[in-house]
């Protein structure tokens, strides 16, 4: 599969995943329902220090790439803010992966408020794809566990490529952040489907290309989460909803099918079993016979 097609597939996967935090943060529910805290990327014009990537990466002892440079995308740091945080407070996601809460003042420069390093984290039974797997990454959002406890989504991705198409997938381990800068060894949920995107060629003859309304079979899916009071005080149950679209090959867009599956993930459930509770019910961007 060519570079152009691969880039398009990964771009779409990123877009569908980005919908997750926005949907979770604004999901309708009761007044008592907790919400995810999405991070908002800081625009270049709003960054208080243009040299922040080098300085913040040095503070974290991280080997960072240069934002916007070809080949450095997997190692480039990203800077975010969370809604309602005090002025001068930021979150940085660095290779490793690492999550930093940092502060900036014109007189003092950058300081690390908290640092969570996931370079020692290994997701269980990671899926193999084509070629080298991409590095683990942290999705820019915080997910409530109950009380003042939050988790982050550590994403393990893989891809497939072949003539005329390809696909990319991501599973998420939701791992609790410790107040002292550590992280839980056991995730709240393991291998929960997070996003997927797949394209299969559907045209093979000149007649197909000239007359077909759609020359590929397209799939895309993404996760939404809701958080509700659980049976145990101080703990939240999660409601995971998977939404997937399937546009069949050689059919008009009006024939696109839509799937929505929801499962409840009670607090304290075996992490792998929790992930499988959703995975076993969805196509995950694969054709269903």
Where do the model's predicted regions map?
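Signature of short aromatic-glycine-proline-rich micro-motifs recurring in repeat-based ectodomains
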Residues: 72-79, 128-142, 209-228
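Short N-terminal edge-element motif at the start of the domain
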Residues: 79, 88-148, 160
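N-terminal secretory signal peptides that target proteins for export/translocation
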Residues: 1-7
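Basic/polar, acidic-poor N-terminal "presequence/leader" segments
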Residues: 47-102
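Eukaryote-skewed repeat-based solenoidal scaffolds used as protein-protein interaction platforms
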Residues: 137-148, 153-173, 188-196
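Acidic, small-residue rich beta-repeat scaffolds with periodic aromatic anchors
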Residues: 27-69, 165-171, 177-289
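Short beta-strand elements that form the blades of beta-propeller/WD-repeat-like
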Residues: 87-94, 149-161, 234-241
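Bacterial N-terminal signal peptides
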Residues: 11-21
